[in-house]
Structure formats: C-alpha cells, structure tokens
C-alpha cells in the first residue's frame, strides 16, 4: 500500500541528487591552464605540466620530469624560465644521463651571468635537455656541459656548480 509512495520519494531524491551534482560540476572552477610561469602570476604559482601550481620546485621537478633521480641530500631548486635550476648539484657520471655529457670546454663572459651563457650554448644544441656550469674562478670562468639523456640522475657536488634541467612545456 505504501510501496508506490516510497518509489515516488526515491525518484524525487534521485532527481535532487542529479540536479545538485550537475550544479556542482558546472560551478566548479576549472584548473587554470598555462604555458609559462607568467600565466600563473596572479597567485604567485608556477606552470607545471600545463597547470598552475604552488608546489615547491623540487616537488614540481619530480612530477614534471619522468624518472628523475635525485640524491636525498638535494633539498631544493629554483624555478627558471624553461629550466629547474639546482645549485651545488652535478650529474651522476656513472648513470646513462651522465654518460651523455658533452663538454663545451671552458667558457667566460664579461656579463657575470656565466650559467645563463652556458644555458644559452646548450639550448643551441639539438636534443639538449640539461646543462651544467662549474665555476673555476671568480670573474666568469668555468666549464660548461650539456646533457641529452632524458632521465636525469643528479647528485650533490661542490658549491660552485649550477645545474639546469629542462621543464616540460605543453
């Protein structure tokens, strides 16, 4: 006798749940899509794999770069345009990544941004996904290396090395 009433109530409840579900999906703010960090400047976030995020540089690098292996003593990095920048870090030369090291030799500049100069040299090389600048003396003299293997293995080094690994840009 009460069976049809129960069916109607269940039907009404299901309709309400469906309406609320569609309303929630429609009014949920979409994730902001980006191509560069400047697309995310409104909240101080960075662009990682096409989405604005407030993750630390190290967490972003782990998410962004497939199969990256970092020495546990590496605790931070910096976002740079197109690269994750690691200080006091070098490639593990025993790894497949380290074995692709291309020595560009000693470089020097007069504009005190030697690591950026090294980066620009490596960007000109086809297939380069990383660069390393090892400062030999104050005044802009150091060795520049490029890397082509896409599975970075990084370890701590002396305080004069700077390593850059390309960020994935969608």
Curated annotation (Swiss-Prot):
Entry superkingdom: Viruses
Membrane topology: Single-pass membrane protein
Induction: Early structural protein.
Transmembrane segments: 2-22
Residue spans, topological domain Virion surface: 23-170
Cellular component per GO, a single term: virion membrane
Entry keyword set: Early protein, Host cell membrane, Host membrane, Membrane, Transmembrane, Transmembrane helix, Virion
Intravirion side stretches: 1
Subcellular locations according to the entry: Virion membrane; Host cell membrane
Protein family (similarity comment): Belongs to the asfivirus envelope protein p22 family.
Name by which UniProt lists this protein: Envelope protein 166
Native species: African swine fever virus (isolate Warthog/Namibia/Wart80/1980)
Species lineage: Viruses, Varidnaviria, Bamfordvirae, Nucleocytoviricota, Pokkesviricetes
